[in-house]
Amino acid sequence: LTYVFEMEETTFFKHYSEKQQENTLIDICIQAQKKVNRLVPEVPFSNIWIAKETADRIPANSVIHFGILNSLRSWNFFETPEDVLCYANTGGFGIDGCLSSCIGAAISNPKKEHYLIIGDLAFFYDLNSICNAIPCNVHILLVNNGVGTEFKNYDNRAAMFEMDADPFMAAKGHNGFRNSELVKKLCANLGVMY
């Protein structure tokens, strides 16, 4: 230790709080986002498109839960209403528990509407959680595209296998493969409104 400055904490914080705040990083991020929005005005139907079209339509004072990785990443590009709380169960950093976490949060906070944005692999993986009574304040947006889209991203290790990643890592053609009838019948059999 070379230098010691002894003073009251209030003196220290008062001095630095009087400085004009510089939000340069956030300003850079906002400008970058605006540039991306200008360069890519039309997004093709995809997880990003779903996020773009729905982010500002989530009802005020509600809660969004995101499936891990692709859902979460896609929605990070768009603004949700300021009073909407956003969560993602990233504890296991995998597909396990997104659906059950949302249901648990909705049970513990029944005065708020809870929306879950989840991919098909995560949904089917955690399907057991809807076998019990789901509170009426849970709404699920299932992106049933038949494949683990995350494994298609250039920065995912599975991407180097290209189409060979489909059957082994991206689970293309899994049991629920783009089958809305399967999901509809599962919900009907479990007494869940589809």
Tell where the protein language model's regions lie, with residue ranges.
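Thiamine diphosphate
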Residues: 77-194
